[in-house]
């Protein structure tokens, strides 16, 4: 591994890394006032998911499905073949995914959670265990819906926001081996690794950790799958931070990552650079047939999987563009740029910055708000009220639990500032910094929330709050 001081994204003799694209189509932003936004918050019951897009100046809730597509992707969409069976678009899509992953079976889905549902419904059941570095929300929910248990085994540094470990997304190999060793035959149907680790700050997984995880799984006869939503960002982190990879291309590194595993789930709405789509890839023919049977039942025929032909062609093109190194250099530097400025203001953030978002440690910032009063939700609300910026809560609302009316807090309360790909410029980010600085000065005046309504599963999408 290289030292942190060499992680800089330099570009020749100039320090400024420009957006490696020109803007061809624009969408107007409607300006709003703080008074309007306070009314919007009340109407939305302080849930960021309930705010309408027309009331948002800059939308940093998620990087999923919010990318701007390229002219080449739009051109590819015109080739879209919408044949119900045997679509030409599918075979172009399949060829692109196989070239990247090397998997024998590629099954399109309308997005990543559909791939998760099909996979886990096929192979998981009551009493089984699925380990991961950290399961994201839909992954955990789809596993638990089968009666299985989702177990998080990220290394200790992954739960320490200020730790500068270069690969905080790594799975704890000792804990993984202990789990596999103690499990009954068939109790662990598969092992997952999320690259990058979204719930832990968008932190990467090293190639060595991927390699050793695969070796452990083979030793115990357990299939090894990736949650590959942000595979390209992970590959570029490996290039920057892991010894022996500096002179390898991001594309070659990504191919090596996939070939260490037996399969993956993928939301193409992230590193596929599209607005909808995903896939399930694997080498096991029996599992693939089970998955296709479920696909036909709920998604569609195996050569379209709930997607139009144009979407399949856009994904095929996006998977090539996302591995262009000028783009990846700009992408990671954009996140680092925001992180540096928030850090300078005084915000406690997850260090080092991840690949798709900056994560503020709201629990550390708002010490006067206890975890059961949702400090991350408080910060999200303040950032929207004062600047019209929508961010995401990755904390107690998303990962905490309510057991018989008592809140069981999550490990961390983070505010995720996720940057959509190729959608905003540096001026937008500079505005975000100004708003964040204003809110920072008001931090001691922020209040907590109590829950007034919630769902039993994935409650953060529909939860309703009131101030306390």
Residue ranges and their predicted role:
Residues 7-10, 14-48, 52, 56-67, ...:
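Conserved PLP-enzyme active-site core in the AAT-like
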Residues 9-11, 322, 398-468:
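PLP-dependent enzyme catalytic core of the Aspartate aminotransferase-like
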Residues 71-78, 362:
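A short, surface-exposed helix-loop junction/capping segment
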Residues 276, 356, 413-417:
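Short amphipathic alpha-helical segments
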Residues 282-283, 360-362, 419-421:
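Short beta-strand-to-loop capping motifs
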Residues 288-289, 367-375, 422-431:
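Short, conserved charged micro-motifs
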Residues 303-381, 385-411, 446-457:
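Conserved small-domain helix->loop->beta segment predominantly found in fold-type I
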């Amino acid at each position: 591994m290289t030292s942190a001081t060499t992680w800089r994204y330099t570009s020749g003799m100039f320090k400024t890394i420009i957006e490696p694209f020109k803007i061809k189509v624009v969408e107007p932003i409607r300006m709003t006032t703080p008074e309007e936004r306070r009314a919007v918050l009340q109407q939305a019951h302080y849930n960021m998911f309930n705010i309408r897009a027309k009331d948002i100046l800059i939308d940093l809730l998620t990087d999923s499905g919010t990318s701007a597509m390229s002219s080449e992707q739009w051109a590819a969409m015109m080739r879209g073949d919408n044949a119900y069976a045997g679509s030409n678009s599918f075979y172009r899509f399949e060829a692109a995914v196989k070239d990247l992953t090397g998997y024998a079976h590629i099954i399109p889905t309308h997005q990543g959670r559909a791939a998760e549902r099909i996979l886990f419904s096929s192979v998981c059941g009551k009493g089984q265990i699925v380990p991961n570095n950290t399961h994201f929300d839909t992954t955990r929910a789809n596993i638990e819906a089968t009666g299985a248990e989702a177990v998080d085994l990220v290394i200790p540094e992954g739960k320490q926001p200020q730790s500068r470990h270069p690969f905080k997304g790594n799975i704890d190999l000792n804990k993984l081996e202990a789990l596999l060793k103690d499990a009954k035959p068939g109790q662990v149907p598969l092992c997952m690794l999320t690259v990058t680790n979204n719930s832990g700050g968008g932190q990467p997984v090293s190639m060595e950790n991927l390699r050793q995880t695969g070796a452990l799984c083979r030793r115990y006869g357990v299939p090894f799958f990736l949650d590959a939503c942000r595979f390209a960002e992970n590959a570029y982190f490996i290039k920057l931070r892991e010894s022996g990879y500096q002179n390898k291309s991001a594309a070659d590194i990504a191919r090596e990552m996939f070939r260490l595993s037996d399969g993956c789930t993928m939301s193409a709405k992230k590193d596929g650079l599209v607005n909808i789509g995903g896939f399930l890839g694997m080498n096991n023919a029996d599992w693939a047939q089970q998955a296709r049977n479920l696909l036909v039942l709920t998604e569609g025929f195996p050569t379209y999987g709930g997607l139009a032909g144009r979407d399949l062609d856009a994904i095929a093109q996006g998977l090539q563009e996302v591995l262009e190194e000028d783009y990846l250099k700009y992408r990671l530097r954009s996140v680092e740029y925001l992180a540096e400025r928030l850090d300078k203001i005084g915000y406690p953030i997850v260090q080092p910055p991840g690949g798709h978002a900056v994560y503020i440690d709201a629990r550390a910032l708002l010490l006067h708000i206890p975890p059961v009063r949702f400090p991350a939700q408080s910060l999200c609300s303040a950032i929207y009220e004062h600047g019209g910026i929508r961010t995401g809560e990755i904390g107690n609302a998303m990962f905490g639990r309510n057991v018989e009316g008592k809140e069981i807090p999550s490990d961390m309360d983070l505010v995720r500032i996720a940057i959509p790909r190729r959608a905003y410029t540096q001026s937008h980010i500079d505005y975000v910094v100004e708003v964040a600085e204003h809110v920072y000065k008001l931090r001691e005046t922020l209040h907590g929330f109590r829950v007034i309504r919630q769902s039993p599963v994935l409650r953060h999408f529909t939860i309703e709050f009131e101030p306390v």
